[in-house]
Amino acid sequence: MSKVAVITGTNSNLGLNIAYRLLEKIPFSEDITIVVTSRTLPRVRECIELINKFHSQLERSGSLSFDYILVDFTDMVSILNAYNTLSKKYARLDYFFVNAAQGAYSGIDWFGAVKEILVSPMKAVTNPKYKIQKVGVKSDDGMGLVFQANVFGPYYFIHKLKPLMKKGNCKVIWVSSLTAKSEYLNTNDLQLLESDMSYEASKRLVDILHYATYEELAKDGIHQYLTHPGIFTSRSFYQYLNVFTYFSMLALFYIARFCGSCWHNISGYKAANAIVHCATSDVSALDNTIKFGSATTKTGKEYVDFDKSFQCPDSEKDAVKLYFEDLRNEWDLKLKDQIKDTRKP
């Protein structure tokens, strides 16, 4: 039976490289179906073409099949429809990568960027604060846009897909961030509507949610892991860079790596290492209580590092879990009789 892998945000640099590395790491005799997700059909076609091209270079005897769902994680009806499509076609899911992410960016504070680079260059290219993010942006569903796109939307999707995941002893891999610091999240603002660092706060929320839910999922045979890709070149910010600033950024990344930063992977392929490591390693060799990070040496040799530093009071984890469960139940009621065909763009 062909294994089934759902990769959210497949059309991103990281999403494509998750697919590439997964094909390299699973047994070459194994049949697999990759479910490409995107908001638009042209991007789906582009992804399938690129993954097929990569696969043709591998000496695999197992077959590769493709499927797709059009899903927007800032639209709850879209998520429900995507679930309906998958539940009709598949009896089980084996891999589920929570990679789709969105930020409410509006530009770069160039004065702040120059100052930060001069004062603390390593911090400036590892945990920057000069990216300008809009405050108070809501989705059409009335929730915090970044909260819904990065955390609640995927969480709700997983909730709906649990029966399929249970049958496949699915591995759920959340992609967090190196910047998921506790200082960015106000637990009185879980929808991140008051935050000017909503992207980073959403990733901190991902961390808390993982630690609050992985044990419960394990009871159903669903294995959930927390990862981060380190620092790499992402297309999400290209619109704010010109040729000079882009190559300056790359140069700073390489300098940071040479100076000892293990997190500057730079390439999307190396950034996907820890993510696929968790997906393809034996469960007995993995630990749900740590955060797996993609890392490299000064010379660019890749490896998987481990972060055991997560700290969060149990009361905070319990409060976050309860908030998500209540919101999930609320949307279960709202979404009755809302299913449509996801294959109509």
Can you annotate each of these PLM segments?
Residues M1-N81, T85-D94, G103, K171, ...:
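NAD(P)H-dependent oxidoreductase Rossmann-fold/reductase module
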Residues F97-K134:
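Conserved NAD(P)H cofactor-binding loop of Rossmann-fold oxidoreductase domains
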Residues V135, V146-F147:
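A hydrophobic alpha-helix adjacent to the NAD(P)-binding/active-site core of NAD(P)-dependent oxidoreductases
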Residues G136-D140:
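Juxtamembrane membrane-interface segments at transmembrane-helix boundaries in membrane proteins
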Residues I158-H159, Y211:
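A short, exposed helix-loop element centered on a Lys and neighboring polar residues
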Residues M165-G168:
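Helix-to-beta-strand junctions that scaffold the AdoMet/dcAdoMet cofactor pocket
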